[in-house]
Amino acid sequence: MSSSQNNNSSWIDWFLGIKGNQFLCRVPTDYVQDTFNQMGLEYFSEILDVILKPVIDSSSGLLYGDEKKWYGMIHARYIRSERGLIAMHRKYMRGDFGSCPNISCDRQNTLPVGLSAVWGKSTVKIHCPRCKSNFHPKSDTQLDGAMFGPSFPDIFFSMLPNLTSPLDDPRT
C-alpha cells in the first residue's frame, strides 16, 4: 500500500488489507466509537485514537499488537450484531471463508470459528455446518480465534432464520 493511499485511509483499512485478514469484516466507525461496545476492553481511548486516525506510513512503527487485539475483540462483538451478521452472511454466501475439505460435504461453505474466546489460545479455524467439524483454513491466516469465538457458527445460524444449517435441511 503506497503512502498516498494511506493518507486517506485509517488503521482499520490498513489492517484489513493485510494478507491473511480476509476473514474479518469492516467494523463501522460508529460501532467502534460506541462506548457500550468498548466495555471491558483495556486502553480503549488510546487505541481508538490510533485505529481511527489516518495512517501516514505503514512503516512508521505502528503498535500492531494492542490494536490488533482490541480490533479483534470489537470484531467478535460486532459479528454478533444484526449489521455484523449481515456482513458475515455476505462473506459466507460468496465463499470467502473457504469450503469444507470433507468430500461428503460437497464443497459446503464454511464459517470462521475460534476454539476459545480467550485471546492467544488458538488461531482461527473454519467450521463446516454440514459435518459440524472444524478444520485449519487453506488460506494464509494467523488470525486469533478469539476474533470470532467458539459460538459464532451457532449464533450465525440461529440469528439468520432464512439461512439454516445444511444439517437441518431435510434433503441432506
UniProtKB/Swiss-Prot annotation:
Coiled coil: none annotated. One of its GO terms (cellular component) is nucleus. It comes from the Eukaryota. SMART domains: CK_II_beta. One of its GO terms (molecular function) is protein kinase regulator activity. Probably not expressed in wild-type flies. In males lacking the Y chromosome, it is testis-specific and constitutes the main component of star-shaped crystals. Gene3D superfamilies: 2.20.25.20, protein kinase ck2 holoenzyme, chain C, domain 1 (1.10.1820.10). Induction: In wild-type flies, it is strongly down-regulated by double-stranded RNA (dsRNA) interference mediated by Su(Ste) transcripts. In males lacking the Y chromosome, the absence of Su(Ste) locus, relieves such down-regulation, explaining why it is strongly expressed. InterPro entries: Casein_kin_II_reg-sub_N (IPR016149), Casein_kinase_II_beta-like (IPR035991), Casein_kinase_II_reg-sub (IPR000704). Unknown. In males lacking the Y chromosome, its strong overexpression leads to the appearance of proteinaceous star-shaped crystals in the primary spermatocytes causing meiotic drive, possibly by interfering with normal casein kinase 2 activity. There are multiple copies of the stellate gene in fruit fly, encoding proteins that are extremely similar, which makes their individual characterization difficult. Thus, most experiments probably do not discriminate between the different members. Interacts in vitro with the casein kinase 2 alpha subunit (CkII-alpha). The relevance of such interaction is however unclear in vivo. Belongs to the casein kinase 2 subunit beta family. This is Stellate protein CG33239/CG33241. It comes from Drosophila melanogaster (Fruit fly). The lineage of its organism: Eukaryota, Metazoa, Ecdysozoa, Arthropoda, Hexapoda. The gene is Ste:CG33239.
